[in-house]
A protein has these predicted regions:
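N-terminal glycine-rich anion-binding loop in soluble enzyme alpha/beta folds
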Residues: 1-68
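Short, acidic/small-residue loops that bind anionic groups at enzyme active sites
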Residues: 35-37, 101-123
Length: 134
């Protein structure tokens, strides 16, 4: 087994309990696989009670930045081989949270910025579009 065989996708669950499951299902559905063994290795870790409310933090109703707990989940995923991590939570991509996560996680781990990636996709796939509504 070479080192590429040990690499896997990590998914942070627990921020919207079904969001992590939904992301994993979408990855499976988009994977071209003739057998079970052809699927991409994925690990999802969902520890919702450990990650504080993102909105409460951003509104100043809590001093606890959820970045700390999210970073710990990423660290655990990294230890079991995840080298690219998906975080299916829009609120966790807010600058005060996301930037703190980036500062805390291992440098060899790529945390996908979901919003930036969607923006890149739209620009590449639909270059004439100037405005996008959410």
């Amino acid at each position: 087994m070479n080192t590429d065989d040990k690499k896997m996708i990590g998914v942070i669950g627990g921020m919207g309990p079904h969001a992590g499951i939904d992301l994993v299902q979408k990855i499976f559905n988009q994977t071209k696989a003739a057998s079970d063994q052809d699927h991409l290795p994925i690990a999802m870790l969902s520890i919702p009670h450990s990650i504080s409310d993102r909105t409460e933090f951003l509104l100043g109703k809590s001093d606890v930045n959820p970045a700390s707990a999210i970073s710990e989940v990423i660290g655990t995923l990294s230890k079991i081989g995840a080298c690219i991590i998906g975080m299916p939570c829009n609120t966790a991509h807010a600058t005060p949270i996301f930037n703190e996560i980036i500062e805390r996680i291992p440098k060899e781990v790529k945390l996908v910025h979901m919003i930036n990636e969607v923006s890149k996709f739209i620009k590449n796939k639909y270059p004439s579009i100037e405005n996008v509504g959410i």
